[in-house]
Amino acid sequence: MTAPQPNRSEAAPVPSERAGATFQWTVRVYWEDTDAGGIVFYANYLKFFERARTEWLRALGVEQQRLRDEVGGMFVVTSTQVKYHRPARLDDLLLVTARVLEAGRASLTIDQTARLQAPTADGDSPLLCEGHIRIGWVDAASMRPQRIPPAILDALNAPG
Protein backbone atom coordinates (compact mmCIF):
# COMPACT_ATOMS: atom_id res chain seq x y z
CA MET A 1 0.00 0.00 0.00
CA THR A 2 1.32 3.43 -0.93
CA ALA A 3 1.63 6.06 1.76
CA PRO A 4 -0.88 8.90 1.36
CA GLN A 5 0.52 11.96 -0.37
CA PRO A 6 0.14 15.30 1.41
CA ASN A 7 -2.15 17.89 -0.08
CA ARG A 8 0.03 20.19 -2.15
CA SER A 9 -1.36 23.25 -0.38
CA GLU A 10 -0.22 22.24 3.08
CA ALA A 11 2.97 22.48 5.01
CA ALA A 12 3.89 20.24 7.91
CA PRO A 13 1.75 20.82 11.00
CA VAL A 14 3.23 22.43 14.05
CA PRO A 15 3.20 19.87 16.90
CA SER A 16 -0.11 19.99 18.73
CA GLU A 17 -0.59 21.30 22.19
CA ARG A 18 -3.37 19.85 24.29
CA ALA A 19 -5.79 20.66 27.08
CA GLY A 20 -7.40 23.75 25.62
CA ALA A 21 -4.20 25.01 24.06
CA THR A 22 -4.05 26.12 20.46
CA PHE A 23 -3.00 23.89 17.55
CA GLN A 24 -1.20 25.73 14.74
CA TRP A 25 -0.94 24.68 11.09
CA THR A 26 0.69 26.45 8.17
CA VAL A 27 -0.84 26.77 4.69
CA ARG A 28 0.43 28.60 1.61
CA VAL A 29 -2.00 30.51 -0.61
CA TYR A 30 -1.99 29.14 -4.15
CA TRP A 31 -3.46 30.58 -7.34
CA GLU A 32 -6.48 28.28 -7.01
CA ASP A 33 -7.26 29.82 -3.59
CA THR A 34 -7.66 33.34 -4.97
CA ASP A 35 -10.50 35.12 -6.74
CA ALA A 36 -10.48 37.50 -9.71
CA GLY A 37 -9.39 40.32 -7.39
CA GLY A 38 -6.23 38.42 -6.43
CA ILE A 39 -7.20 37.78 -2.81
CA VAL A 40 -8.21 34.54 -1.07
CA PHE A 41 -11.80 33.69 -2.00
CA TYR A 42 -13.83 33.99 1.20
CA ALA A 43 -15.07 30.37 1.24
CA ASN A 44 -11.52 29.04 1.09
CA TYR A 45 -10.91 30.12 4.68
CA LEU A 46 -13.43 27.43 5.65
CA LYS A 47 -11.30 24.91 3.72
CA PHE A 48 -8.20 26.10 5.56
CA PHE A 49 -10.06 25.76 8.87
CA GLU A 50 -11.21 22.23 7.95
CA ARG A 51 -7.68 21.14 7.10
CA ALA A 52 -6.31 22.58 10.35
CA ARG A 53 -9.00 20.77 12.38
CA THR A 54 -8.23 17.51 10.60
CA GLU A 55 -4.47 17.85 11.19
CA TRP A 56 -5.09 18.81 14.83
CA LEU A 57 -7.23 15.72 15.42
CA ARG A 58 -4.67 13.57 13.59
CA ALA A 59 -1.89 14.98 15.83
CA LEU A 60 -4.00 13.88 18.81
CA GLY A 61 -4.26 10.35 17.37
CA VAL A 62 -7.84 10.83 16.16
CA GLU A 63 -7.89 9.66 12.55
CA GLN A 64 -11.32 10.43 11.16
CA GLN A 65 -11.41 7.78 8.42
CA ARG A 66 -10.34 5.07 10.88
CA LEU A 67 -13.06 6.17 13.31
CA ARG A 68 -15.66 6.01 10.57
CA ASP A 69 -14.50 2.55 9.52
CA GLU A 70 -13.92 1.07 12.99
CA VAL A 71 -16.29 2.98 15.27
CA GLY A 72 -18.99 3.87 12.75
CA GLY A 73 -19.11 7.56 13.61
CA MET A 74 -17.81 10.84 12.28
CA PHE A 75 -17.73 14.55 12.86
CA VAL A 76 -19.90 16.82 10.71
CA VAL A 77 -19.98 20.60 10.65
CA THR A 78 -23.29 21.81 12.06
CA SER A 79 -22.69 25.57 12.08
CA THR A 80 -20.14 28.19 11.16
CA GLN A 81 -19.71 31.81 12.17
CA VAL A 82 -16.93 33.60 10.32
CA LYS A 83 -15.63 37.17 10.37
CA TYR A 84 -13.19 38.48 7.77
CA HIS A 85 -10.68 41.18 8.76
CA ARG A 86 -8.01 41.50 6.06
CA PRO A 87 -7.28 39.77 2.75
CA ALA A 88 -4.57 37.20 2.11
CA ARG A 89 -2.89 37.09 -1.27
CA LEU A 90 -1.10 34.68 -3.59
CA ASP A 91 1.97 33.04 -1.98
CA ASP A 92 1.19 34.30 1.53
CA LEU A 93 1.94 31.83 4.30
CA LEU A 94 -0.93 31.63 6.76
CA LEU A 95 -0.92 30.31 10.30
CA VAL A 96 -4.27 28.64 10.92
CA THR A 97 -5.24 27.72 14.49
CA ALA A 98 -7.78 25.48 16.18
CA ARG A 99 -8.76 25.45 19.85
CA VAL A 100 -11.70 23.87 21.67
CA LEU A 101 -13.94 26.64 22.89
CA GLU A 102 -16.70 24.40 24.23
CA ALA A 103 -17.11 20.63 24.53
CA GLY A 104 -20.54 19.08 24.84
CA ARG A 105 -21.65 15.45 24.90
CA ALA A 106 -22.26 15.30 21.16
CA SER A 107 -20.55 18.41 19.79
CA LEU A 108 -17.49 20.62 19.96
CA THR A 109 -17.25 24.33 19.26
CA ILE A 110 -13.85 25.12 17.79
CA ASP A 111 -12.36 28.62 17.80
CA GLN A 112 -10.28 29.11 14.65
CA THR A 113 -8.16 31.90 13.22
CA ALA A 114 -6.05 32.57 10.14
CA ARG A 115 -3.17 35.03 10.42
CA LEU A 116 -0.29 36.00 8.17
CA GLN A 117 2.62 33.87 9.33
CA ALA A 118 5.26 36.48 8.51
CA PRO A 119 5.01 39.42 10.87
CA THR A 120 4.59 42.92 9.47
CA ALA A 121 7.19 45.67 10.01
CA ASP A 122 5.69 46.41 13.44
CA GLY A 123 6.10 42.76 14.49
CA ASP A 124 2.39 41.96 14.31
CA SER A 125 0.95 38.88 12.59
CA PRO A 126 -2.29 40.36 11.24
CA LEU A 127 -5.55 38.54 11.88
CA LEU A 128 -7.15 37.77 8.52
CA CYS A 129 -10.16 35.67 9.47
CA GLU A 130 -11.68 34.19 12.62
CA GLY A 131 -14.49 31.78 13.17
CA HIS A 132 -16.38 29.50 15.48
CA ILE A 133 -17.05 26.13 13.92
CA ARG A 134 -19.40 23.68 15.62
CA ILE A 135 -18.90 20.03 14.80
CA GLY A 136 -21.23 17.26 15.91
CA TRP A 137 -20.58 13.54 16.27
CA VAL A 138 -23.00 11.39 14.27
CA ASP A 139 -23.54 7.75 13.43
CA ALA A 140 -22.02 7.44 9.94
CA ALA A 141 -24.83 5.22 8.61
CA SER A 142 -27.88 7.04 9.98
CA MET A 143 -26.36 10.55 10.33
CA ARG A 144 -28.11 10.80 13.71
CA PRO A 145 -26.34 12.56 16.61
CA GLN A 146 -24.50 10.42 19.15
CA ARG A 147 -22.24 11.06 22.12
CA ILE A 148 -18.63 11.73 21.26
CA PRO A 149 -16.63 8.57 22.08
CA PRO A 150 -14.76 8.86 25.39
CA ALA A 151 -11.42 8.11 23.70
CA ILE A 152 -11.77 11.27 21.61
CA LEU A 153 -12.66 13.42 24.61
CA ASP A 154 -9.73 11.88 26.51
CA ALA A 155 -7.36 12.79 23.64
CA LEU A 156 -8.67 16.36 23.64
CA ASN A 157 -8.18 16.68 27.40
CA ALA A 158 -4.88 14.80 27.78
CA PRO A 159 -1.96 16.83 29.08
CA GLY A 160 0.64 17.73 26.45
What does each model-identified segment do?
Residues 45-48, 76, 134:
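Residue-level recognition of specific faces of alpha-helices
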Residues 57, 66-75:
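Short, solvent-exposed helix-to-loop capping segments enriched in aromatics
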Residues 71-87:
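Small beta-barrel nucleic-acid-binding modules, principally OB-folds
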Residues 2-62:
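Catalytic strand-loop segment that frames the active site of acyl-thioester-processing enzymes
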Residues 40, 75-77, 128:
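A broad, structural micro-motif
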Residues 2-17, 21-25, 84-93, 101-160:
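HotDog/MaoC-like acyl-thioester-processing domains
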